[in-house]
């Protein structure tokens, strides 16, 4: 499996894009990630003006010609979610009206992904609505990373390439030379994700935390299924939001005798009170996330490790542009 652990930052471009029609455009959600992707591809992002009017309306203008180009719009729909999503759709419309040949929305973090089904009557399936809105805005293709559930890929009636942050996380974990590893799913719903992660980690054993959620953002861990005593436990999830699920799981693992505890997630949503929960010195040895969502400075703490997914996204963008396989990146 190709290593995607760090972003390339060298003088020589990785690809020959001298006469290419590939163009990168970054929204305001994660410009640093977009810069790293551009560095990997050896090109520069197309300049963009994005501003807000006094009444809160957004304005976007592409600052150079993209006529006939293969345009990739880089925009995680993270907080502020509604503004990020609306800005992305306005960017798409601007590219469409500027005669771009193809428009791909690169969405490292897909907001509203947790609203992927109805759990009670009279609820919206907002993940499907979001997919519909993106399609109607004029997107030709979507490139997403670690969707909350695989079924969201099927919400789109256009091509949707789904890639995974696990190679980046596993490259880093393997560099730590950990021993007696057990991969732990923080809830029953994440078992498939944890099983796939464990298989990639030299077929490590799997444990599951049986948990019941009494209300939104309130999590209660009950018991551990599997052996964790004396082992290095790696809690794996797609995202860390308030930190309730993963921290309650870690507390239970500690009570059950786990020797070391690492938390891993692709998306650092980090809503309050996640900082207070995750920065506890006696809970996690490390909290490992990717830069799919920018981590604001005042949320950094000693145990936090942020890994770049720029190489992986850049490679996927190049393969889409060249009409070659994306799935083979993960074989």
Curated annotation (Swiss-Prot):
One of its GO terms (cellular component) is ribose phosphate diphosphokinase complex. It is found in: Cytoplasm. Binds 2 Mg(2+) ions per subunit. Gene3D superfamilies: 3.40.50.2020. ATP binds at residues 55-57. GO terms for biological process: 5-phosphoribose 1-diphosphate biosynthetic process; purine nucleotide biosynthetic process; ribonucleoside monophosphate biosynthetic process. HAMAP family: RibP_PPkinase_B. Belongs to the ribose-phosphate pyrophosphokinase family. Class I subfamily. The active site is at residue 211. Its EC number is 2.7.6.1. Pathway: Metabolic intermediate biosynthesis; 5-phospho-alpha-D-ribose 1-diphosphate biosynthesis; 5-phospho-alpha-D-ribose 1-diphosphate from D-ribose 5-phosphate (route I): step 1/1. It comes from Prochlorococcus marinus subsp. pastoris (strain CCMP1986 / NIES-2087 / MED4). The keyword Nucleotide-binding applies. InterPro entries: PRib_PP_synth_CS (IPR000842), Pribosyltran_N (IPR029099), PRibTrfase_dom (IPR000836), PRTase-like (IPR029057), Rib-P_diPkinase (IPR005946), Rib-P_diPkinase_bac (IPR037515). PROSITE patterns: PRPP_SYNTHASE. SUPFAM superfamilies: PRTase-like (SSF53271). Involved in the biosynthesis of the central metabolite phospho-alpha-D-ribosyl-1-pyrophosphate (PRPP) via the transfer of pyrophosphoryl group from ATP to 1-hydroxyl of ribose-5-phosphate (Rib-5-P). Its main location: cytoplasm. It catalyses: D-ribose 5-phosphate + ATP = 5-phospho-alpha-D-ribose 1-diphosphate + AMP + H(+). D-ribose 5-phosphate binds at residues 213, 237, 241-245. This is Ribose-phosphate pyrophosphokinase. Keywords: ATP-binding, Cytoplasm, Kinase, Magnesium, Metal-binding, Nucleotide biosynthesis, Nucleotide-binding, Transferase.
């Amino acid at each position: 499996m190709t290593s995607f652990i760090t972003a390339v930052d060298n003088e020589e471009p990785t690809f020959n894009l001298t006469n290419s029609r590939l163009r990168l455009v970054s929204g305001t959600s994660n410009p640093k990630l977009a810069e790293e992707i551009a560095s990997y591809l050896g090109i520069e992002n197309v300049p963009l003006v994005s501003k807000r009017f006094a009444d809160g309306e957004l304005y976007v203008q592409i600052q150079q010609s993209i006529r006939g180009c293969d345009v990739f719009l880089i925009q995680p729909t993270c907080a502020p979610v509604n503004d990020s999503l609306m800005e992305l759709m306005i960017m798409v419309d601007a590219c469409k009206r500027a005669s771009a040949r193809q428009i791909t929305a690169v969405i490292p973090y897909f907001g509203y992904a947790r609203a992927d089904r109805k759990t009670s009557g009279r609820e919206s399936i907002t993940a499907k609505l979001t997919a519909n809105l993106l399609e109607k805005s004029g997107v030709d293709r979507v490139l997403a990373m670690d969707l909350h559930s695989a079924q969201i890929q099927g919400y789109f009636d256009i091509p949707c390439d789904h890639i995974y942050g696990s190679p980046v996380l596993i490259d880093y974990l393997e560099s730590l030379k950990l021993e007696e590893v057990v991969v732990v799913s923080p809830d029953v719903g994440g078992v498939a994700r944890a099983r796939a992660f464990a298989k990639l980690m030299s077929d490590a054993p799997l444990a599951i935390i049986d948990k019941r959620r009494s209300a939104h953002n309130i999590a209660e861990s009950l018991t551990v299924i599997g052996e964790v005593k004396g082992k290095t436990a790696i809690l794996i999830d797609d995202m860390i939001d308030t930190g309730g699920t993963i921290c309650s799981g870690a507390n239970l693992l500690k009570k059950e005798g786990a020797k070391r505890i690492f938390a891993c997630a692709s998306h650092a949503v980090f809503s309050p009170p996640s900082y207070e929960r995750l920065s506890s010195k006696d809970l996690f040895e490390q909290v490992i996330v990717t830069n799919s969502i920018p981590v604001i400075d005042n949320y950094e703490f000693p145990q936090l490790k942020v890994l770049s997914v720029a190489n992986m996204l850049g490679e996927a963008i190049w393969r889409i542009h060249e009409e070659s396989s994306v799935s083979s990146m993960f074989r």
